[in-house]
Amino acid sequence: MLATRNRLRTSTDFSTTVRSGVRNGRRNVVLYTVAIAADEPSRIGFIVSKSVGNAVVRNLVKRRLREAGALSLQQYGTGFAIVVRALPAAAAASWDQLLADYNAALETTMKRLGGRLPRAASVVSRETRQEGTPRA
């Protein structure tokens, strides 16, 4: 299970990461990654739509992707926001296939970020809402 500080939870955070992030797709997943403040913990969010399968299958895919995300936090513990979108093929994929696709897509997005690795100003920030005012 991912700690609360390591999860993307608001629709604003998801949409900002998907719109402005670096994207890389594989057979089973599409990853969007954006650099946030270097001192913020990395945060991961998951999108698993009904096209992946029924509730049982979707939850299995989410559990596997959450574990892959937790493993990646050991290497990229601070400074990134990541959104993982599961594709319909993920329903039939084994753990090894999902993990390989996740890691390959993550490595590619990190390389593409290049000089944009963690920056001082956060694109996705826990302290601001959509209007830009501090949270209470």
Curated annotation (Swiss-Prot):
The main enzyme category here is hydrolase
InterPro entries xrefs: Ribosomal_Su5_D2-typ_SF, Ribsml_uS5_D2-typ_fold_subgr, RNase_P, RNase_P_CS
Record's GO cellular component terms: ribonuclease P complex
**Which keywords belong to this entry?**
Endonuclease, Hydrolase, Nuclease, RNA-binding, tRNA processing
Q: Does the keyword Cell inner membrane apply?
A: no
Q: Please list the GO biological process terms of this entry.
A: tRNA 5'-leader removal
Reaction catalyzed: Endonucleolytic cleavage of RNA, removing 5'-extranucleotides from tRNA precursor
Q: Name one GO molecular function term.
A: 3'-tRNA processing endoribonuclease activity
Q: EC number(s)?
A: 3.1.26.5
**Which Pfam family, just one, is annotated for this protein?**
Ribonuclease_P
Q: Which SUPFAM superfamilies match?
A: Ribosomal protein S5 domain 2-like
Quaternary structure? Consists of a catalytic RNA component (M1 or rnpB) and a protein subunit.
Instruction: State the protein's purpose.
Output: RNaseP catalyzes the removal of the 5'-leader sequence from pre-tRNA to produce the mature 5'-terminus. It can also cleave other RNA substrates such as 4.5S RNA. The protein component plays an auxiliary but essential role in vivo by binding to the 5'-leader sequence and broadening the substrate specificity of the ribozyme.
Question: Record's PANTHER family?
Answer: RIBONUCLEASE P PROTEIN COMPONENT (PTHR33992:SF1)
Protein family (similarity comment): Belongs to the RnpA family.
Name by which UniProt lists this protein: Ribonuclease P protein component
Source organism per UniProt: Arthrobacter sp. (strain FB24)
